[in-house]
Structures are given as C-alpha cells and as structure tokens.
C-alpha cells in the first residue's frame, strides 16, 4: 500500500477533491497524481490564479486552468 498513481481515494480525499503533491485528485478518476507545480486546495485549484474548482484545474507537467 503506497502512494503511487492509481491509488483509490480515501474519504478524506473525496471531501477535498482538488489536491496536489502526494495527495489524491478525486476530480481525475480518484487517482493520485505527482502534481508538483500547482497548489490545489479544497477551495479550487490555484494555478498562479484562482480557478473555479476541481473541474477547472488541469495538473500535469505544467499547471493550467481550463
């Protein structure tokens, strides 16, 4: 049981659907992503500017707002 990609979301993660780092991104099929460039919070995804929520956040090699 590690923190790799594909890990199922915990209930705590489901309550905060847009998180980055070693945490889950429940908005992306409940998988964990090694997203280091954005700062996602339960209030939405902050990618240098605020996005409207998990669905407007796209985390990858670079972070952007859809």
Curated annotation (Swiss-Prot):
Binding site for Cd(2+) 6: 47, 59, 63, 65
Residues reported to bind Cd(2+) 5: 40, 45, 47, 51
Domain of life, per lineage: Eukaryota
GO molecular function: metal ion binding
Keyword Metal-binding in annotation: yes
UniProt-listed InterPro entries: Metalthion_mollusc
Stimuli inducing this protein: By cadmium.
Presence of the UniProt keyword Hydrolase in the record: no
Positions contributing to Cd(2+) 1 binding: 9, 13, 26, 30
Modified residues (N-acetylserine): 1
Residues involved in Cd(2+) 4 binding: 38, 51, 57, 65
UniProt: Cd(2+) 2 binding residues: 13, 18, 32, 35
Record: residues binding Cd(2+) 3: 20, 24, 26, 35
Keywords: Acetylation, Cadmium, Metal-binding, Metal-thiolate cluster
Domain commentary: 14 cysteine residues are arranged in C-X-C groups. These are thought to be the metal-binding sites in other metallothioneins.
Function: The metallothioneins are involved in the cellular sequestration of toxic metal ions and regulation of essential trace elements. Binds almost exclusively cadmium.
Family of this protein: Belongs to the metallothionein superfamily. Type 2 family.
Annotated protein name in UniProt: Cadmium-metallothionein
Organism: Helix pomatia
């Amino acid at each position: 049981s590690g923190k790799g990609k594909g890990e199922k979301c915990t209930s705590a993660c489901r309550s905060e659907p847009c998180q980055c780092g070693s945490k889950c991104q429940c908005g992306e099929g409940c998988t964990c992503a090694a997203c280091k460039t954005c700062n996602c919070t339960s209030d939405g995804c902050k990618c240098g500017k605020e996005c409207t929520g998990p669905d407007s956040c796209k985390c990858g090699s670079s972070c952007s707002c859809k």
